[in-house]
């Protein structure tokens, strides 16, 4: 769904869908002066999403509740940070909101659940409070909250460069493709720790110059498998972080072993900093059949699993 970001809501309540993402490509190029890593990524939205309900109030206060008792609803939550940030853009200092999160994306899974929730909050309150910020303005705000937030706002299939906030569209891909996504529910991986571990092991090989960064970006742009990206030409998935996470994380190895056993899987990889892993299928029906045929094996593995179609957009208003 395309959102008119300047559209003002006449209602006192609305809901926003916040989809997860996977990394079809994640390449660590080097280290930036601002302390972040320089990345070359291809990210894809999938049809696994959180739902966030917003109710407008007039007391200037912002509150957050969730159906997940394990989720912090304090000031460290990106939803509250996003709400407080966009509240500063409103000319009405009395605007407030009661926010409720229905959590479906697993936490600490490399799926940008927190970033997508932040993006959904920017979109929801931009409309509910009548602020009228444009897509570019919201993406700029989002980049202050996290590197993945701009992608989550736009969604679909995007090149993500810089620390992840610099987006470039790619030619339209075959949206009928789908994934089986799996994760050990007892395991989380810290994204900062994953990058720190990668730097510790591979830092001596980092590129140093902008012209070298750009050569790697262009190499990704020119990759033959992107045109077309479809079931006859699946992507040769690459995730540099997998090189450091997989050897020391049994949950990742277990997930990849399970996925590799599924009939019809085209390619597989870890997403983001993990521990979630995914296998790509030609279509959703094929993914569902493959998973259903392996329910007993899935139960024995201790993994949670989802079948998710590729999604052509990011956060969207719930109609």
UniProtKB/Swiss-Prot annotation:
UniProt keyword terms in alphabetical order: ATP-binding, Isoprene biosynthesis, Kinase, Nucleotide-binding, Transferase
Binding site for ATP: 106-116
Gene3D superfamilies xrefs: 3.30.230.10, GHMP kinase, C-terminal domain
Pfam annotation, one family: GHMP_kinases_N
Active site: residue positions: 21, 148
InterPro entries xref list: GHMP_kinase_C_dom (IPR013750), GHMP_kinase_C_sf (IPR036554), GHMP_kinase_N_dom (IPR006204), IspE (IPR004424), Ribosomal_Su5_D2-typ_SF (IPR020568), Ribsml_uS5_D2-typ_fold_subgr (IPR014721)
One of the GO BP terms on file: terpenoid biosynthetic process
N-terminal signal peptide: none
This protein's pathway: Isoprenoid biosynthesis; isopentenyl diphosphate biosynthesis via DXP pathway; isopentenyl diphosphate from 1-deoxy-D-xylulose 5-phosphate: step 3/6
Catalytic activity field: 4-CDP-2-C-methyl-D-erythritol + ATP = 4-CDP-2-C-methyl-D-erythritol 2-phosphate + ADP + H(+)
EC number of the protein: 2.7.1.148
GO molecular function: 4-(cytidine 5'-diphospho)-2-C-methyl-D-erythritol kinase activity; ATP binding
The UniProt record lists the keyword ATP-binding: yes
UniProt keyword annotation of ATP-binding present: yes
Family per similarity comment: Belongs to the GHMP kinase family. IspE subfamily.
NCBIfam families: ispE
Function: Catalyzes the phosphorylation of the position 2 hydroxy group of 4-diphosphocytidyl-2C-methyl-D-erythritol.
The protein's name in its UniProt record: 4-diphosphocytidyl-2-C-methyl-D-erythritol kinase
């Amino acid at each position: 769904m395309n959102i008119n970001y300047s559209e003002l809501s006449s209602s006192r309540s609305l809901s926003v869908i916040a989809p997860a993402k996977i990394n079809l490509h994640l390449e660590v190029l080097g280290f930036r002066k601002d302390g972040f890593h320089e990345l070359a990524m291809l990210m894809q939205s999938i049809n696994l999403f959180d739902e966030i309900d917003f109710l407008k109030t007039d007391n200037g206060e912002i509150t957050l509740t969730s159906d997940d008792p394990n989720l912090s609803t304090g000031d460290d939550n990106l939803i509250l940070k996003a709400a407080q940030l966009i509240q500063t853009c409103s000319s009405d200092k009395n605007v407030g909101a009661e926010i409720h999160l229905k959590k479906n994306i697993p936490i600490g899974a490399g799926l940008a659940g927190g970033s997508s929730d932040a993006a959904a909050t920017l979109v929801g309150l931009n409309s509910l409070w009548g602020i009228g910020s444009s897509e570019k303005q919201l993406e700029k705000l989002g980049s202050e909250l996290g590197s993945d937030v701009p992608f989550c706002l736009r969604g679909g299939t995007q090149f993500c460069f810089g620390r992840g906030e610099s987006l470039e569209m790619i030619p339209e891909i075959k949206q009928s493709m789908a994934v089986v996504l799996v994760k050990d529910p007892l395991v989380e991986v810290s994204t900062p720790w994953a990058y720190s571990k990668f730097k510790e092991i591979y830092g001596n090989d980092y590129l140093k110059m902008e012209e070298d960064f750009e050569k790697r970006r262009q190499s990704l742009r020119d990759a033959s498998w992107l045109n077309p990206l479809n079931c006859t030409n699946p992507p040769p998935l690459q995730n540099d972080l997998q090189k450091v996470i997989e050897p020391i994380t049994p949950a990742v190895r277990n997930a990849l072993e399970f996925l590799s056993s599924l009939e019809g899987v085209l390619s597989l990889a870890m997403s983001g900093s993990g521990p979630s892993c995914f296998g790509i299928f030609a279509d959703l029906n094929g993914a569902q059949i493959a998973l259903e045929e392996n329910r007993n094996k899935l139960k024995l593995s201790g993994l949670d699993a989802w079948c998710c179609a590729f999604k052509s957009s990011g956060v969207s208003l719930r109609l």
